[in-house]
Amino acid sequence: MAAVSSAASLRGADYENGLRGGAGPSGGGQDPGEDDPMGRGTLDLDLELLGQGRRSRRVGGRTAPGRRSGGRGGSGGGGAGGLEELEDEELEEEEPGELTGDQTIEDPELEAIKARVREMEEEAEKLKELQNEVEKQMNMSPPPGNAGPVIMSIEEKMEADARSIYVGNVDYGATAEELEAHFHGCGSVNRVTILCDKYTGHPKGFAYIEFSDKESVRTSLALDESLFRGRQIKVVPKRTNRPGISTTDRGFPRARYRARASSYSSRSRFYSGYTPRPRGRVYRGRARVTSWYTPY
């Protein structure tokens, strides 16, 4: 509205000046539109100011400094063209600035996402390497354990059994270290084996001790019926399992039978240390077990 009112006032002033400007050769008033440059210039200035007001509203009410003065000082066409170019340049400068600001906001987020993806890929590669190493170790470890019993011949097993003893009535809470310490005075101990139930994992109450020489076996027999963890243990030489005889462990009754068989010399001596009742239980128990497991 200010632009329109200023244009109207300027136009009225210019019109009065044109009328006062005197008469031409014929004595009449001079036409402002023919010779006076203010006539057409005033019209162009009005259009320019109107267009400037519209542009200022379109841009958002912000106009560059010196627009009106440039429009007044220059010609109508030149001033309007200069203002349009100036406005276009300002718009072009503002738009790239806004895009640049958006890019500066998005770039750190993209970089963070890319960095996270790289970290996840590195972790996946490390996990694959660890898994491959574990698989290699698992593939390499079973063969030595499985090859031991296969490589050992019957003669070697018999020789190892000749250096071993059977220890019965062992406390269920006993450990291999405690047994080794109990028989340490008899000689060098190579291995201590405490048998456990394969279903429950609980100890069966007996163990095998392997010495480095046969002399240690004879020395260890002196600990027969000695106290170990409050129990009187039974110490006898270990028997070698012969081919054709079942090696399945049937628990404590079999261990008692093995202990008796090791001291067997005659039929009368076999029955001398035991009452008929336990003997009958052992026999009937073994018979029932055999009948139960006939399908196997």
From Swiss-Prot:
The RRM domain is essential for specific adenine bases recognition in the poly(A) tail but not sufficient for poly(A) binding. Transmembrane segments: none annotated. GO terms for cellular component: cytoplasm; nuclear inclusion body; nucleus; ribonucleoprotein complex. This is Polyadenylate-binding protein 2. Residues 163-240 form the RRM domain. It is found in: Nucleus; Cytoplasm. The gene is pabpn1. Residues 84-97 have a biased composition (Acidic residues).
